[in-house]
A protein has these predicted regions:
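C-terminal non-catalytic regions of proteins with extracellular/luminal or membrane-system context
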Residues: 3-21, 33-34, 56, 64-226
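Short glycine/proline- and acidic residue-enriched helix-loop micro-motifs
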Residues: 51-60
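Conserved, charged catalytic cores of large soluble enzymes
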Residues: 29, 33-52
């Protein structure tokens, strides 16, 4: 990707004598020399190989490195003694990112959401199934919000009955748990190129769920997806 400022104006500027044509030749020559060193004149599609891609795309080494980077990049904002989690206690995972595969973020056009590991999928490998429950609670954004991306627009709309059932299930799980982990945050279409926000807050539908969960169980850990 590049700006169109050069393509749109250089010809005119050369004709008007504002830009020396030799300067353009020098710049083009540097690009051609680099391409020659890379062997692109002999093989313009160098390394663009579907079979080679399979060897390193999502390979164990790369996934392990990505996991390590994620583990070491967490920022703890506050802890009132709830963390680290006591695996002997009953834990409820409540929130729209509990089992949400749409966590690739922007500029992941060739990625497949099914390859993303959700919090629930990871937790099921660590915690005792008899002491953990999972509930979505609410969608990432409410029906009153429409988001527009490069290839998609409006997220799924939920009926009032669906929203009520999701919330009821989440609150019941929160009541019965010793502590609650709430994975929540902004929609992936709210982050990235051309998505500046006037208010960088958590969507209100999630905040409503958070307040209701807090009312039935004060032991809450929030995991923000931003």
């Amino acid at each position: 990707m590049m700006t169109s400022v050069y393509a749109a104006n250089l010809c005119r500027l050369v004709e008007e004598g504002e830009v020396d044509e030799h300067l353009i030749d020098e710049c083009c020559l540097r690009i051609l020399e680099l391409k020659n060193k890379l062997g692109l004149f002999e093989n313009p599609y160098k390394d663009a190989d579907a079979e080679k891609e399979k060897a390193y795309n999502l390979c164990p080494e790369h996934r392990a490195l990505a996991k390590k980077a994620a583990e070491e990049s967490f920022v703890l904002l506050k802890n009132d003694g709830v963390l680290p989690l006591d695996t002997a206690k009953k834990i409820a995972f409540v929130g729209p990112y509990t089992n949400n595969h749409e966590i690739k973020s922007s500029w992941s056009f060739t990625g497949d959401s099914k390859d993303c590991v959700t919090i629930q999928e990871a937790a099921e490998k660590v915690f005792d199934a008899s002491r953990t429950t999972y509930a979505e609670g609410c969608p990432v954004i409410g029906n009153d919000v429409e988001l527009i991306g490069f290839t998609e627009t409006t997220p799924k709309k939920y009926s009032e009955e669906e929203l009520a059932a999701m919330e009821q299930s989440a609150l019941q799980a929160a009541k019965e748990a010793d502590l609650v982990v709430m994975p929540m945050g902004e929609h992936y279409l709210q982050s990235g190129e051309a998505t500046s926000r006037a208010m960088i807050d958590v969507p209100e539908i999630q905040m409503e769920l958070f307040r209701k969960v807090l009312a039935v169980n004060p032991n809450v850990v929030v995991v923000l997806f931003n």
